[in-house]
Amino acid sequence: MRIICLLLAVTLVFSCKKNDQPGPNYNSDKSRLTQLTDSLMNVYNNSVEGNKPGDYSVGARGSLKAALDLAAQVESGKFTQEEVNNAYSNLALAGQQFSTKLIQEVSAQYLVGHWKFNGNAADSSGHGHNGALKTGYVGSSAATATDGGTLPQLTADRFGRANMAYSFGNGSLIQVPYASELNSPSFTISLWVDMTSNSNGSYMISMNRWWGYKFNLNGTAVPFLTVATAATIYDRDAGAVNVAAGVWTHLAASYTDGTMKFYVNGELKKTWTNTPGAAVTLASPVDLSIGNEMPKEFYNMTDNSNPAYFWGASYFVGSMDDIRMYNKVLTDAEVNSIYIIEKDL
């Protein structure tokens, strides 16, 4: 009898507690959630997926939209303050994750020259290293040197867009005034080339040839980088790599004290680790040359003991586009990112 009474008492207590509990409080403040939803919806509506700086990675918009849809359900429905707060936190996290999907320019703070060749030779890096179209020498010696009389010509780029790249030949070049940030102890060069024909002197980009640095193709179309240091001059190549004629190819090379690297279409092809010393700073500034070894006015045509002596024309024949110059060594991943960003529209 005592057990039955105890059970009845417990039942009554729990029954009373259950009946006394208030229902969920749906009188919640959704103002913060609404503000965040509106803000991120604006971001979503103005975002584009793609592979260029300023785009978002493919699939990123779908993830954000799913989070926005869930938040909208909470805004329009009956939910407690705790549930509203959770929805806010989840949406804020989705917004933060979405921001990490923004494709940014590779090492923008170290990009000291970017010649996109979009109708002109202007530098889009923000550093003002604009190029000028110039003619260059042709001829096999100083005695036979003549002005080629040809300027670089706007041509179609690798996507077939007219006037979005430059073709070079007959000594033509783009001349960029000397600047110390283009003459860095460590650097990376990135560019696209479509070689028409090749020779030992296919200079793609150069600052004072052997006495500064030069990036060219050798006689078998192997990428070749020459860098002068205080102690010596290093000539290194990309190894068993031959650039094909008539095909747009992405090339990159980097140099720092002790290491030189070569890349083709975003892939590391060769690493040299026997190049100690920083790249030299030129004692007498020489302008940067794209498409030829050196601008005409910097040659010495009479004294073959002079480092600036003209030994014969060395210039690129073909088209180039999207040339980048960094005053640091990019990582392998960064070079590959440039290739990914630039290989498609």
Named regions from a protein language model:
Residues 19-78:
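Amphipathic, heptad-repeat alpha-helical segments
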Residues 66, 103-107, 320-345:
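Extended recognition patches within non-cytosolic domains
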Residues 116-149, 337:
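Short, tryptophan-glycine- and acidic/Ser/Thr-enriched carbohydrate-recognition patches
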Residues 135-183:
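Low-complexity, glycine/proline/serine-rich flexible segments
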Residues 178, 184, 189, 193-195, ...:
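Glycan-recognition/cleft segments
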Residues 189-191, 247-255, 262:
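Short tryptophan-centered beta-strand motifs in secreted/extracellular beta-sheet-rich domains
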Residues 226-250:
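Short, aromatic/His-centered strand-loop micro-motif at the edge of beta-sheets
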Residues 274-317:
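Flexible glycan-contacting loops in extracellular carbohydrate-active proteins
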